[in-house]
Regions:
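Short glycine/serine-rich loop segments
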Residues: 124-247, 424-431, 437-440
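Glycine-rich, small-residue loops and helix-cap segments
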Residues: 41, 52, 94, 134, ...
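A short helix-breaking turn/cap at a secondary-structure junction
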Residues: 209-292, 309, 463-484
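Acidic/His- and Gly-rich active-site-bordering loop/insert found
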Residues: 74-76, 84-157
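Short helix-loop capping/hinge segments that flank enzyme active sites or metal/cofactor-binding pockets
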Residues: 92-112, 264-266, 320-372, 384-388, ...
Length: 484
């Protein structure tokens, strides 16, 4: 059902709960704990999903994370998990998840955040959705995105997806709906994807942990051509263990605790913004300093070493972003006159870029080779994620193309280079920042370093534990009034 069409505030029927005896205590648990309980028969997948649907109904009107809530379908799928003959082998048995509205869920419509077309329901699951379901996960809903997933705030006609930490601010984008759902405790794990930071920016905004895999590690198949190969699928989580399991499922590997490196890591620190004139705020600098101190205390070697992001690499990122709008609009058969004005301009520029042949594979290859040299004597790069607090929660879709891209560039200059390079990049919380909002940092590794990044994130999680859910919506503390 559409999230705006149900009898409850979120589209979930008011009576979805099963009364006082329902297992409300399961809401807010990590995915790994929920799955362990369902595998062992200590928890029913139906009860787990029903409890999360009830929490969704309580908070959704104030967050706006979901376009579709799959109440009946999710409960039926949960019952199938309970009856599964190999339930004890499912790594995500009974775990409620959300899926971003730009990958296919069988039987559901994929809109890519646009009203410029009327697509038919998907005939089959996207490969990453199929892998999540095969692992026992239950899709409770489809999360909101900005039109064509182009922007770093999530809003559209009649909807603004708000940050559970401060509802006056955006949950970021383009996986903003997925991030808001996790931060509000509605699901412990959500699928998203990242073409210029679309997993990492919402994770930073909402105090979550995420990993953008390197090229070819997880099936992409996002839109027409995954933005010329820049976009990758991943998950958003509240713990590193949940992230590691989600990543393993998407990558088609057996979930396992990431192995420790042989010795201390050599960590390079970079704070220089690729966008001239953008500076990191004091809270972001403090978060970096805290992480640097913990890395040194753990025995790692920390050095300053700025990567060289060439003008060609920076331009290559922008041309792929522009071209992606045009190629996706073409592949979806969109009525371009029905696009939001900002997206119409974006796609028009993208058509010119494509016709001029400005998306050049050699640009990405050259930058990857340069970064391979950079990582010859360092294991990991540490950098900021964003320059300051998330953008205000407002109808950005009503503003023009220049206003949107300027706001995006000033807030989020540190993520897109690693998309064009095809390198893995992980974001994790690093303590409270300005106005009580989360602060986060980014780790980037060479090709194939996903496990290294997950291990390092787990080590820092132990040394710098973070609050897993936004305080107002924390299932452990009840549901109060929204901030902002």
């Amino acid at each position: 059902m559409d999230a705006s069409a149900g009898s409850g505030p979120s589209g979930v029927p008011v009576g979805v709960g099963s009364g006082e005896g329902m297992l409300d205590g399961v809401v807010g648990l990590p995915a790994t704990e929920l799955a362990a309980g369902v595998r062992a028969g200590e928890l029913s997948a139906v009860d787990v999903v029903r409890a999360h649907l009830r929490h969704l109904a309580a908070v959704e009107a104030r967050v706006g994370a979901f376009r579709v809530v799959r109440t009946e379908a999710a409960l039926a799928e949960a019952a199938a998990v309970d009856a599964h003959p190999d339930r004890s082998r499912l790594p995500l048995a009974g775990v409620p998840i959300a899926v971003k509205d730009n990958v296919a869920v069988a039987g559901e419509v994929v809109t890519d955040g646009s009203r410029a077309h009327l697509p038919a329901p998907a005939a089959a699951d996207h490969p990453v959705v199929a892998r999540l379901r095969a692992a026992g996960a239950v899709v409770v809903g489809i999360t909101r995105v900005p039109e064509l997933c182009l922007y770093s705030a999530t809003d559209g006609a009649g909807t603004v997806t708000r940050n559970p930490w401060d509802t006056a601010r955006s949950a970021a984008g383009s996986s903003g709906g997925s991030a808001a759902a996790v931060a509000a405790g509605v699901v412990p794990l959500a699928q998203g994807n990242d073409g210029m930071g679309s997993l990492r920016l919402p994770a930073a905004a909402c105090g979550l942990v995420t990993l953008k895999p390197g090229s070819g590690v997880v099936p992409a198949q996002i839109g027409a051509d995954s933005w010329s190969g820049m976009a990758e699928n991943g998950v958003l989580a509240t713990t590193v263990a949940d992230l590691a399991v989600g990543f393993a499922v998407l990558a088609g590997t057996e979930p396992a605790t990431p192995a420790a490196p042989v010795g201390p890591l050599r960590v390079a620190v970079s704070t220089r913004s690729p966008v001239p004139g953008v500076r990191l705020d004091a809270a972001g600098r403090a978060a970096l300093d805290v992480v640097i101190a913990e890395l040194r205390a753990a025995g790692h070697v920390v050095v300053e070493k700025e990567p060289v992001i060439t003008p060609a690499a920076a331009l290559g990122t922008i041309t792929r972003w522009l071209a992606g709008a045009d190629s996706d609009a073409e592949a979806l058969g969109l009525d371009r006159q029905a696009l939001e004005p900002r997206s119409r301009t974006h796609a028009r520029l993208g058509r010119w870029v494509r016709r001029a042949g400005l998306v050049r594979p050699q640009t990405a290859a050259a930058f990857r080779a340069r970064m391979a040299g950079y990582f010859a004597d360092v294991d990991v790069l540490l950098s900021p994620v964003v320059s300051g607090p998330p953008l205000p929660a407002r109808p950005w879709h009503e503003r023009g193309f220049l206003a949107n891209i300027t706001a995006n560039a000033r807030w989020a200059p540190w993520t897109s280079a690693w998309n064009v390079a095809g390198l893995p990049a992980l974001v994790l919380p690093a303590g409270p920042g300005r106005e009580g909002l989360p602060s986060s940092v980014q780790f980037v590794g060479p090709a194939g370093a996903e496990t290294r990044l997950l291990w390092l994130a787990g080590e820092l999680e132990g040394r710098l534990p973070w609050r897993r859910h936004a305080p107002v919506f924390d299932p452990a503390g009840g549901v109060g009034e929204p901030a902002g």
